[in-house]
């Protein structure tokens, strides 16, 4: 697990540009911040609107958040969701379990990214 605390992540979001996106019919702002190879994302809507099996394309990740060319998510702070960041920067979210429960502190979830 990464050592960055949820407070540090939440504080970083306060000064991070957002991208307007749509997830399962809900509009909201997605915030991105990076600590090393960990990209944290926040979406200010109701993750429970993502039903099991949904795989919406969330957004295009800005170039600054793509330090590696091949990457896959190893962990998230929700047990139901898996994120993939494609080489073109688009992000896909797959929910294989029950509906995703909102996280506290800005509804963020963390993506552990590996690659070279």
What are these regions (language model features)?
Residues 1-17:
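Fibrous stalk/shaft segments of extracellular and virion attachment machinery
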Residues 42-44, 96:
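Structured loops at beta-to-helix junctions and adjacent beta-edge loops in soluble globular domains
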């Amino acid at each position: 697990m990464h050592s960055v605390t949820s407070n540090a992540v939440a504080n970083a979001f306060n000064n991070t540009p957002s991208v307007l996106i749509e997830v399962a019919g809900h509009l909201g702002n997605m915030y991105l911040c990076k600590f090393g190879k960990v990209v944290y994302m926040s979406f200010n809507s109701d993750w429970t609107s993502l039903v099991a099996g949904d795989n919406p394309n969330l957004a295009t990740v800005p170039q600054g958040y793509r330090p590696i060319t091949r990457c896959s998510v190893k962990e998230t702070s929700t047990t139901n969701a898996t994120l993939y960041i494609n080489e073109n920067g688009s992000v896909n979210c797959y929910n294989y379990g029950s509906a995703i429960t909102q996280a506290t502190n800005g509804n963020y979830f963390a993506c552990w990214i590996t690659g070279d």
